[in-house]
Amino acid sequence: AKIEQIVGWLKGVYADKPAVIAVSGGVDSAVALTLLVLALGKDKVIPICLPYGKQDMADARLIIEFNELKDKMIEINIEAVVEEMARLVVAEEGSVRKGNIMARTRMIVVFDLAKKLGAMVCGTENKSEHHLGYFTRFGDAASDVEPIAGLYKTEVWEMAKILGIPEIFYTKEPSAGLWEGQTDEAEMGFSYKDADLVL
């Protein structure tokens, strides 16, 4: 029922406009992308991959192929922009500041492409991240539409299973994809399962 509810809501919000969505290879963007395709159809959804340097985008490509959107994918490497910005403001490698610069650079690219394509930006924020403050203001939290903002992380995993999304998306460790080996739970110091029990 929750899926139908979100899909119906997305149809109403987007009307005839296309959607752009940054696809990272994590479960949040996988679920949001799949819901968008169910709501708007493949013709109206443009997935955007924004790797940093040699960042592995295999899972992002996997969910894009799962939704049969390979031909519509836009890929832009953000490394040069991030490095220049980090150099200008002297943000250290692996720091929260550098991570924020990455998230905000992705936001700039996604909103610019939305403007170019006459589209609305679909976000991938979940309720757990929001309550925990685990996001970058004006970065990954910036969007026009947030289809999974009402779902806790544990509910996002459940929805991924129901949608038939490949298992890798709900079995791997969640990561914001900011640097090598970075995981949400290591940064927060607790698991989403534990957090959701409290939230």
Give the residues covered by each predicted segment.
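ATP-dependent adenylation/nucleotidyltransferase module used to activate substrates
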Residues: 1-132
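Catalytic subdomain that performs nucleotidyl-dependent activation
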Residues: 65, 97-106, 119-191
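Short alpha-helical "packing" element that flanks the helix-turn-helix/winged-helix DNA-binding module
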Residues: 194-199
